[in-house]
């Protein structure tokens, strides 16, 4: 069964990396791709995703562990679950001067509508991620920054959410592993 094979691989990666502060972009993409493939099976034809990796990205660069999966899970749970039509998640990883920029965008119902509908969840995933980054930043001169944007059309109707993280080129996770 394809589902069980993918699920088993996902769990193996999660357990292997559970105690790590960071992992490579390549490893994070592998993990989130497995996660999204499993969710596609669940959502059937109502979920699409795209991962855009700028050609000059060094996929060995370290990023916070579970970063992409946390944002993708949040987008699925709050943004896309109640959306009519096909939901889409777009992940873009690119270099900017002095940092790597990673964005996760959904075309969901938006954060305000999700609050109105009372979508289930504790908000713990994003809270834990923010706390982890605060700890990482304590050990680095250059800081990781996170931004959340509410997307809308020309009529100010919500069209999704975009999470963006800026990771400085000289960021060091090594001191956190010891």
Feature roles, as predicted:
Residues 1-149, 155-157:
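Two-component histidine phosphotransfer core
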Residues 168-173:
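Two-component histidine kinase transmitter core
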Residues 174-178:
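Short, charged, solvent-exposed linker or helix-capping segments at domain edges/interfaces
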Residues 89, 158-167:
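Hydrophobic core positions in the C-terminal catalytic ATP-binding module
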């Amino acid at each position: 069964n394809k589902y069980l094979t993918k699920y088993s691989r996902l769990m193996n990666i999660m357990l292997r990396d559970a105690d790590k502060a960071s992992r490579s972009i390549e490893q994070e993409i592998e993990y989130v791709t497995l996660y999204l493939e499993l969710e596609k099976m669940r959502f059937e034809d109502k979920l699409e995703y795209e991962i855009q990796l700028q050609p000059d990205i060094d996929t060995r660069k370290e990023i916070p562990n579970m970063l992409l999966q946390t944002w993708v899970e949040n987008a699925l749970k709050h943004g896309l679950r109640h959306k009519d039509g096909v939901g889409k998640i777009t992940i873009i990883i690119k270099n900017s001067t002095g940092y790597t920029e990673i964005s996760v965008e959904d075309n969901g119902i938006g954060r305000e509508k999700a609050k109105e509908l009372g979508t289930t969840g504790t908000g713990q995933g994003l809270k834990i991620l923010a706390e982890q980054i605060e700890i990482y930043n304590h050990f680095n001169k250059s800081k990781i920054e996170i931004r959340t944007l509410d997307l809308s059309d020309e009529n100010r109707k919500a069209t999704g959410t975009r999470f963006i993280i800026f990771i400085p080129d000289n960021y060091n996770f090594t001191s956190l592993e010891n």
